[in-house]
From Swiss-Prot:
Organism lineage: Bacteria, Bacillati, Bacillota, Bacilli, Lactobacillales
Protein's name according to its UniProt entry: Small ribosomal subunit protein uS8
Swiss-Prot/TrEMBL GO biological process terms: translation
Disulfide cross-links: none
Subunit and interaction comment: Part of the 30S ribosomal subunit. Contacts proteins S5 and S12.
Pfam families in the cross-refs: Ribosomal_S8
Top-rank taxon: Bacteria
Cellular component aspect of the GO annotation: ribonucleoprotein complex; ribosome
InterPro entries per record: Ribosomal_uS8 (IPR000630), Ribosomal_uS8_CS (IPR047863), Ribosomal_uS8_sf (IPR035987)
Natural source organism: Ligilactobacillus salivarius (strain UCC118)
Length: 132
């Protein structure tokens, strides 16, 4: 079966593993998934990201992060721009998630970046997801 939205699948796997309090998860690799995983690592939402080359597509292993008392670091993930309804924003309309407590991930002409970086560079793009 052909997967119509691999980014939504990636985000759903993270959400499900987080809710089940798994230590890590594996997903088939792609450039955009790799970029999203790196952003999650840099912003402190996941502990580590590992790339496994299997002479095919490759695999991304994401190690989830939990706080004291085993509380979840990721409270929520929402896919915004979907294949059936794309969501684009101009540079002056880049959204803030929960007044800056979360992040928006955007696909821009400069690559996949966070909402903070997009505002600093004054560029808009496609809003991929909100994470808080």
């Amino acid at each position: 079966m052909v997967m119509t939205d691999p980014i939504a699948d990636f985000l759903t796997r993270i959400r499900n593993a987080n809710m089940a309090k798994h230590e890590s998860l594996e997903v088939p690799a792609s450039k955009i998934k790799r970029d999203i995983a790196e952003i999650l690592k840099n912003e402190g939402f996941v502990r580590d990201v590992e790339y496994i080359d299997d002479d095919k597509q490759g695999i991304i292993r994401v190690f989830l992060k939990y706080g004291k008392g085993n509380e979840r670091v990721i409270s929520g993930i929402r896919r915004i721009s979907k294949p059936g309804l794309r969501s684009y924003v101009k540079a002056d309309a880049v959204p803030k998630v929960l007044n800056g407590l979360g992040i928006a991930i955007l696909s821009t002409s400069e690559g996949v970046i966070t909402d903070k970086e997009a505002r600093a560079k004054k560029i808009g793009g496609e809003v991929i997801a909100y994470i808080w």
